[in-house]
Amino acid sequence: MKTYHFPVVVELDEDGVYIVSCPVFKGCHAFGSTIDEALDSLREVIEMCIEEQSLENVNQFIGVREMEVTIPISA
């Protein structure tokens, strides 16, 4: 058995549902009413992604950055 570590993005939508994704795999998303529930679901999705894809052909995760965007406000 081998253990891997993958980056995970956690978001909270307008309905209070946690959406989690692993940017290393395309389409690797899950959701839940708690973060733990969402992460448990994502773990299963990641396992399926590993079974279907070679780990050599996955996206290389670089990082997450915050970006400032200024928009004009009309009077």
What are these regions (language model features)?
Residues M1-H5, V17, H29:
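A detector of short terminal or domain-flanking linear segments
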Residues K26-I35:
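A short, exposed loop/beta-hairpin motif centered on an aromatic-Gly-Thr core
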